[in-house]
């Protein structure tokens, strides 16, 4: 019942959408996400191995990805590495885009309307920068879930800024495993 309610509230996935799986099923989070996919009627794409997650994401083109913070940290580090090896102009455009995205995310995370000029700037940022990050993750990612350990605030802010929200959950094996989580429109980063 709790998993059903939480998935409905979050709009986790719809029938026919693709969820991406690499979490071990011996762990309650991975197993619960598998059961949730069966219940919701999603298609599960599996990573070939942990070292090929990014390549597998591009091939599978998932809508949903549950993961532990370490995976999001690795993706963030790869994006930062690409930024650092870019030209000065590209770094300026990247930094401007992330700043715009963070401002937009503040409105979205509290369920407030985004001002028109900020929405326009965000569409430009998406076209110039964010679309490339989305493409590396398959281009259809709607929701990412993090659990198993605390997710660094800087990393979560970045993903929200680029339009790839990560919803943090907390739970225990005994709570199957999600006890509480952030929901779209009511996100408090770092909680």
Residue spans of the language-model regions?
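Conserved structural elements of the adenylate-forming
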Residues: 1-12, 131
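Conserved AMP-binding loop of ANL adenylate-forming enzymes
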Residues: 7-48, 53-57, 64-67
């Amino acid at each position: 019942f709790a998993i059903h309610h939480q998935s409905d509230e979050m709009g986790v996935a719809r029938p026919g959408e693709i969820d991406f799986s690499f979490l071990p099923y011996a762990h309650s989070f991975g197993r619960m996400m598998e059961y949730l996919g069966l219940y919701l009627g999603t298609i599960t794409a599996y990573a070939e191995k942990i070292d090929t997650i990014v390549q597998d994401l591009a091939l599978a083109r998932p809508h949903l990805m549950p993961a532990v913070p370490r995976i999001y940290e690795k993706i963030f580090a790869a994006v930062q590495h690409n930024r650092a090896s870019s030209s000065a102009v590209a770094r300026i455009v990247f930094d401007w885009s992330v700043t715009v995205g963070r401002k937009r995310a503040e409105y979205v995370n509290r369920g407030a309307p985004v001002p028109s000029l900020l929405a326009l700037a965000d569409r430009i940022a998406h076209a110039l920068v964010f679309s490339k990050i989305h493409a590396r993750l398959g281009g259809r990612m709607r929701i990412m879930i993090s659990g198993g350990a605390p997710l660094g605030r800087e990393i979560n802010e970045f993903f929200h800024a680029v339009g790839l929200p990560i919803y943090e959950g907390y739970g225990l094996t005994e709570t199957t495993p999600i006890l509480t989580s952030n929901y779209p429109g009511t996100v408090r980063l770092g909680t």
